[in-house]
Amino acid sequence: RTQAELEAAWDKLGGVVRRPVIFQTYCSTNTPVPEVAMFIRLAKKYPKSFGYVKEEAAGDMANQRMVKECAAKPVMKRIFSGWGGWQWLYQLRHCGSEGLVTERVAYAPLLMRIWREYEKGDRDGELTEAFAMYRLLVDQRNFPGGGLRDYSLYFLEKEGLFRNRVSRRYLNASETEGGSFGSGRKWKLDKVQISDTQRKELDLLYAEILKALEK
């Protein structure tokens, strides 16, 4: 794919959709990251549907792009963070992020606290602490997977939302802070295995953090 091909395809999409569309950027060697200028052009042409972006370009590129996208308001409507919230606090404070689109529903109580503290202007001085607790939960890199899902599924199972910890796992996957990425489209279903010691630590962390949120 080229930038021109991406824009042509999305131009056709803009002609048929009737509701807001959130574009998600990415880090891929197979497809170029859509140019910010492209998003702006499309948002001008289709103001009722386009102008929403979940920014997940690689590393600091996501931050730089977010600043440019937010500078293009009101043509651009809303710019959201991604990558499991790893850079969310920085992006809230300095890049114009207006929310988080993520699979990390297992940590909803913490994510809610982070957002509410930010909305209040951090007048209680608890925003950094709340984000630090979130990072503690999601940064157990030596636990199974350590990517986007993996041991996080244990919390959903613990709360009775999931009946098991079976998840899609990419073959030849590499783990990064943004999740698990594989080559090609090959994947398998696998159950996340957690040792008794790891389970005890996750239970302890989760209980302590929920207790802190009740204060």
Functional labels for PLM-detected ranges:
Residues 12-17, 27-146:
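Catalytic alpha/beta core domains of metabolic enzymes, predominantly
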Residues 1-33, 175, 190:
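Active-site beta->alpha loop and helix N-cap motifs at the rims of alpha/beta catalytic domains
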Residues 90-215:
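Structured C-terminal cap/extension of enzyme domains
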Residues 23-28, 49, 167-170:
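Glycine-rich phosphate-binding "P-loop"
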